[in-house]
Amino acid sequence: MSEQGGLTPTILEEGQTEPESAPENGILKSESLDEEEKLELQRRLAAQNQERRKSKSGAGKGKLTRSLAVCEESSARSGGESHQDQESIHLQLSSFPSLQEEDKSRKDDSEREKEKDKNREKLSERPKIRMLSKDCSQEYTDSTGIDLHGFLINTLKNNSRDRMILLKMEQEMIDFIADSNNHYKKFPQMSSYQRMLVHRVAAYFGLDHNVDQTGKSVIINKTSSTRIPEQRFCEHLKDEKSEESQKRFILKRDNSSIDKEDNQNRMHPFRDDRRSKSIEEREEEYQRVRERIFAHDSVCSQESLFLDNSRLQEDMHICNETYKKRQLFRAHRDSSGRTSGSRQSSSETELRWPDHQRAWSSTDSDSSNRNLKPTMTKTASFGGITVLTRGDSTSSTRSAGKLSKTGSESSSSAGSSGSLSRTHPQSTALTSSVAAGSPGCMAYSENGMGGQVPPSSTSYILLPLESATGIPPGSILLNPHTGQPFVNPDGTPAIYNPPGSQQTLRGTVGGQPQQPPQQQPSPQPQQQVQASQPQMAGPLVTQREELAAQFSQLSMSRQSSGDTPEPPSGTVYPASLLPQTAQPQSYVITSAGQQLSTGGFSDSGPPISQQVLQAPPSPQGFVQQPPPAQMSVYYYPSGQYPTSTSQQYRPLASVQYSAQRSQQIPQTTQQAGYQPVLSGQQGFQGMMGVQQSAHSQGVMSSQQGAPVHGVMVSYPTMSSYQVPMTQGSQAVPQQTYQPPIMLPSQAGQGSLPATGMPVYCNVTPPNPQNNLRLMGPHCPSSTVPVMSASCRTNCGNVSNAGWQVKF
């Protein structure tokens, strides 16, 4: 330190001489002196610099020689030169004050650096002492700066496991400090968290704590600062418990300390009121308040209640009346077998509902001017559901028709197909269920119109059968223009059994007729056809009437009268305008202008009389309309009626043509004196196959009233198709297939044998010119005529001569 102290003044003196030499250089450069003086000054400065260098190199380290002062040399000069030099130096110093400041700043920096070095040395020594003091528990802080006291208190409060460990460590350390023989203690191996607790507790007690070579055990040693804390850990816990208990107690006291008397005075009146009031008293009070509030509205509420009750009574009365009417209608239908009461009941109901829409009734018809929506029901998997659609089954007051009601007849139906009903704005369809034991039976009905409302067009409905296999034998083919089937002389429809089956039909096919639209209103009674099954209990009897109409259409339904029970499970399907494909089974062809003679079945069930529906021709009638029309096929398979005969088919009907009715129809297709079975071109576009009993050309031309055998047509299982009739703008897409048609003969009439020949009919979509034309070539008397129907080409390549039909 003495050497450093000696170096400082020499450095300071050196610092003083150097700034003095620097101004001399500045004076020589700045002042304008004589050249001689300048040279002398330069020489002096050079000599001084050399002397300084020599002194520095020769003096060695730590030894400095003081150089000569400038003023000493200047004293030897003349007075004028020295005076000038001093003035120049003062001027330079005064003109450059920053030089002095720099010198001072340099001095300050050097001194500061020295002081910093000294302070650093002192600081390096002081931390060691402080670390030792931190390890002691006097300051209650760890080497990391953590407050040990607070940490231990929080650990004791928060974690019960740590609390037990700390209490155990505290007891062991107190025992270690009290034992003067042991100067160190080694704790067993433990986790890092527990070792941290040991370190902090040892620091809190002022013990030296280290880790052994394994690093898993803590060793504590006694030091001069070792102490036992004044408060034990358990005391801190007691304090906390007491504080918590006091807090809880304080909370309780706070709740109960707020003026007990005031609280009692405030609470007791309410308590007394609540306790004193019983349920009855509360109800009485509630009633008083309620009466006071609703006193104004009581009158209105009573009136509204009275009105509601009256309305309910009226509704119940109306419902009861409707139910009674339905029961009466059903009873009347069952007893009389006529639907004349249907229109009357409907009209009576309409009179009682003038203002608002009347309730639904089973006797509703189209005359009520109500647009009925179609109903659809799927009965493919169950047979107990039937559909009953409102429909007018009569077009005049005197009608022999009957409304078909399928209540629970089909409850025993097992395999049934879908039923679909579609109603028109001015027509309704008749719906019934499917019979058991057959893939499906369908009866097509055209929607009739009242005589008061002339329609613009009539639509036909064709429903598909769901079953594609096992088509029952026997069917009826209806003429779309007339709707009349071929019947036997006794009125029963002609039913045919296909060649593939050995069964004949004993049942009959029933239908409900409905009239085509007529512009001239006239009474048009309806024709009824009964449907029966082997389970029929009695014969089905219908009333036959001769009508004055030439054209009518046929629909099918069951009839039940007082002496004729309804079949247990008969099915009738309505028609629909939906373009859906069907699988027709067999057909029986009808034509307009015919008088269907009644006949009897051979080995068959009871006879059924047919009613022929005819109407006078009108400007819009089918007879006088030459535009082309498509054929609508109606069929009713009845394969579920077996017979005991082994014939493949059986002639069951014959048709008679009367001269008067055939003359009323323009006959445009007669050839070679033949009397065509189809008596009119426009009126018989739906004809599929015919059978004649003529023996020669003269026989047909002379005998107009001779009976013509009923045509019995049967189709085997083929792809489904549809042949609808187009009236106006109605058209239905078709599918083509070629089914065989069998035209049987009737034994005992003429010379025709009892065997039939197959008739092959090719039904294809009609071309624009699809008017039906008949070409009758020579037909031998001993053979059955074979007819080929084609919509596009003439089928001339047939084995036998017969009728050839073109569309």
UniProtKB/Swiss-Prot annotation:
<dbReference type="Pfam" id="PF01424">
    <property type="entry name" value="R3H"/>
</dbReference>
<feature type="region of interest" description="Disordered">
    <location>
        <begin position="328"/>
        <end position="434"/>
    </location>
</feature>
<feature type="modified residue" description="Phosphoserine">
    <location>
        <position position="32"/>
    </location>
</feature>
<dbReference type="InterPro" id="IPR051937">
    <property type="entry name" value="R3H_domain_containing"/>
</dbReference>
<feature type="compositionally biased region" description="Polar residues">
    <location>
        <begin position="359"/>
        <end position="380"/>
    </location>
</feature>
<keyword id="KW-0597">Phosphoprotein</keyword>
<feature type="compositionally biased region" description="Polar residues">
    <location>
        <begin position="552"/>
        <end position="563"/>
    </location>
</feature>
<feature type="modified residue" description="Phosphoserine; by PKA">
    <location>
        <position position="55"/>
    </location>
</feature>
<dbReference type="GO" id="GO:0005737">
    <property type="term" value="C:cytoplasm"/>
</dbReference>
<feature type="modified residue" description="Phosphoserine">
    <location>
        <position position="361"/>
    </location>
</feature>
<feature type="compositionally biased region" description="Low complexity">
    <location>
        <begin position="525"/>
        <end position="535"/>
    </location>
</feature>
<keyword id="KW-0963">Cytoplasm</keyword>
<feature type="domain" description="R3H">
    <location>
        <begin position="163"/>
        <end position="226"/>
    </location>
</feature>
<comment type="subunit">
    <text>Interacts with CALM1.</text>
</comment>
<feature type="region of interest" description="Disordered">
    <location>
        <begin position="245"/>
        <end position="282"/>
    </location>
</feature>
<feature type="region of interest" description="Disordered">
    <location>
        <begin position="552"/>
        <end position="576"/>
    </location>
</feature>
<feature type="modified residue" description="Phosphoserine">
    <location>
        <position position="298"/>
    </location>
</feature>
<feature type="compositionally biased region" description="Basic and acidic residues">
    <location>
        <begin position="349"/>
        <end position="358"/>
    </location>
</feature>
<feature type="compositionally biased region" description="Polar residues">
    <location>
        <begin position="595"/>
        <end position="613"/>
    </location>
</feature>
<dbReference type="InterPro" id="IPR036867">
    <property type="entry name" value="R3H_dom_sf"/>
</dbReference>
<feature type="region of interest" description="Disordered">
    <location>
        <begin position="1"/>
        <end position="127"/>
    </location>
</feature>
<dbReference type="InterPro" id="IPR024771">
    <property type="entry name" value="SUZ"/>
</dbReference>
<feature type="coiled-coil region">
    <location>
        <begin position="32"/>
        <end position="57"/>
    </location>
</feature>
<protein>
    <recommendedName>
        <fullName>cAMP-regulated phosphoprotein 21</fullName>
    </recommendedName>
</protein>
<feature type="domain" description="SUZ">
    <location>
        <begin position="227"/>
        <end position="298"/>
    </location>
</feature>
<feature type="compositionally biased region" description="Low complexity">
    <location>
        <begin position="337"/>
        <end position="348"/>
    </location>
</feature>
<feature type="compositionally biased region" description="Polar residues">
    <location>
        <begin position="89"/>
        <end position="98"/>
    </location>
</feature>
<feature type="compositionally biased region" description="Pro residues">
    <location>
        <begin position="514"/>
        <end position="524"/>
    </location>
</feature>
<dbReference type="GO" id="GO:0003676">
    <property type="term" value="F:nucleic acid binding"/>
</dbReference>
<dbReference type="InterPro" id="IPR001374">
    <property type="entry name" value="R3H_dom"/>
</dbReference>
<keyword id="KW-0112">Calmodulin-binding</keyword>
<dbReference type="GO" id="GO:0005516">
    <property type="term" value="F:calmodulin binding"/>
</dbReference>
<feature type="modified residue" description="Asymmetric dimethylarginine">
    <location>
        <position position="650"/>
    </location>
</feature>
<feature type="compositionally biased region" description="Low complexity">
    <location>
        <begin position="401"/>
        <end position="421"/>
    </location>
</feature>
<dbReference type="GO" id="GO:0034605">
    <property type="term" value="P:cellular response to heat"/>
</dbReference>
<feature type="modified residue" description="N-acetylserine">
    <location>
        <position position="2"/>
    </location>
</feature>
<keyword id="KW-0007">Acetylation</keyword>
<feature type="region of interest" description="Disordered">
    <location>
        <begin position="595"/>
        <end position="627"/>
    </location>
</feature>
<keyword id="KW-0175">Coiled coil</keyword>
<feature type="region of interest" description="Disordered">
    <location>
        <begin position="474"/>
        <end position="536"/>
    </location>
</feature>
<feature type="modified residue" description="Phosphoserine">
    <location>
        <position position="381"/>
    </location>
</feature>
<dbReference type="Pfam" id="PF12752">
    <property type="entry name" value="SUZ"/>
</dbReference>
